Amino acid sequence: MAIRNLRFLGDELLRKKSRRVEKIDDRIQALLDDMLDTMYENNGVGLAAPQVGILKRVVVIDIGEGPLFLINPEIIEQEGSYIEQEGCLSVPGRQGEVERPYRVKVKAQNRDGKEIIVEGEEFLAKALCHEIDHLNGVLFVDKIIDVKGE
């Protein structure tokens, strides 16, 4: 396990769409472990593979309830509306209010390749949407309603 270098706003890679993971092998397992370590080291609650320079559809999230490892995640249901402050490890020093769904249901594979369904409301829904946006080349600054910080 290793701490990987983060990519920051202005890096073109963050604006590219990530590719599906076709095979969950040792490299993907190592990526998941490294992403989790990198997220914790930087006091984050979520991290997407593009943030460490890898254009794969891989996300890790931990909102304080233990880590979620999501491979090829996709939102299959969403409802309601929820506006709250967001920040991002790839956009240091900047926050803003973003509108997200209040509740989402996400289909993904876990690190063992098993299909899972993750349902989240409020903070978890926000984290899921934020990280899945990264996989599509979208940053929270693209969705800001009200800007805070630099």
From Swiss-Prot:
Gene: def
UniProt keyword terms in alphabetical order: Hydrolase, Iron, Metal-binding, Protein biosynthesis
Name of one Pfam family that matches: Pep_deformylase
Name the UniProt record assigns to this protein: Peptide deformylase
Claim: Protein biosynthesis is one of the keywords in the record: yes
Organism this protein belongs to: Clostridium tetani (strain Massachusetts / E88)
EC number: 3.5.1.88
Entry-linked HAMAP family: Pep_deformylase
Any one GO BP annotation for this protein: translation
Entry-linked PANTHER family: PEPTIDE DEFORMYLASE
Family: Belongs to the polypeptide deformylase family.
Active-site residues per Swiss-Prot or TrEMBL entry: E131
Example GO molecular function: metal ion binding
